[in-house]
Amino acid sequence: MKAISRVLIAMVAAIAALFTSTGTSHAGLDNELSLVDGQDRTLTVQQWDTFLNGVFPLDRNRLTREWFHSGRAKYIVAGPGADEFEGTLELGYQIGFPWSLGVGINFSYTTPNILIDDGDITAPPFGLNSVITPNLFPGVSISADLGNGPGIQEVATFSVDVSGAEGGVAVSNAHGTVTGAAGGVLLRPFARLIASTGDSVTTYGEPWNMN
């Protein structure tokens, strides 16, 4: 599905490397996709434990959709030079709407609880095995003029620099809203791995209906 536009928000540029993240209370692997890149490495990106909890909007506006997002994204690199892999891991949505009444769509995303596990952010062996949950970025907002008609908006809600043969990032109860869209709103979560060489692979989950 072709997106009308794509917005990338870099949130954790200071993190040099991420390693495998811990689980959540939801069910396991949701989807994955692999790609053999130009250096004969197999790049795999996965989504785990995805859960979007749609709630009644606090503004009580029938054109507002509000939800809380929990889940994980993981990547695995196999093949020659896998340990030297460097790139970016993204999480985001494709947002589908049937009608916008000419007022556009506003997307806001706050991240009260991003978890990063086993991140070697200084020098080994410091054993950072505990979960780190700082308020790395309190909120971002994206607006797009969609006109009178259906459409799709793709938004990368956050992006982290990664290195090494495997790693991941998890988010718990991150908050999102879409306003100004009449009718139901569909959210299709995705995870994308982009190598420093430019190769990329994206896995898309099932759509979630935010009625």
Curated annotation (Swiss-Prot):
The rim domain (28-96 and 152-211) is accessible from the external milieu and is partially embedded in the outer membrane. The stem domain (131-148) is inaccessible from the outside and embedded in the outer membrane, while loop 6 (121-127) is thought to be in the periplasm. One of its GO terms (biological process) is iron ion transport. Forms very stable octamers. Isolated as a 100 kDa complex that can be reduced to monomers upon boiling in 80% dimethyl sulfoxide for 15 minutes. Structures show a goblet with the wide end on the exterior of the outer membrane and a central channel. It is not known if mixed oligomers of MspA with other Msp subunits form in vivo. The lineage of its organism: Bacteria, Bacillati, Actinomycetota, Actinomycetes, Mycobacteriales. It comes from Mycolicibacterium smegmatis (strain ATCC 700084 / mc(2)155). Residues 1-27 form the signal peptide. Induction: Constitutively expressed. The gene is mspA. Gene3D superfamilies: Porin MspA (Ig-like beta-sandwich domain) (2.60.40.1650), Porin MspA ribbon domain (2.10.300.10). This is Porin MspA. It holds the Pfam family MspA. Disruption phenotype: Single deletion has decreased permeability to the antibiotic cephaloridine (9-fold), glucose (4-fold), serine, phosphate and iron Fe(3+). Growth rates are wild-type, due to the other Msp-type porins. A double mspA-mspC deletion takes up less cephaloridine, glucose, serine and phosphate than the single mspA deletion and grows slower than wt or single mspA deletion. A triple mspA-mspC-mspD deletion grows even slower and has reduced Fe(3+) transport compared to wild-type. Its main location: membrane. Belongs to the mycobacterial porin (TC 1.B.24) family.
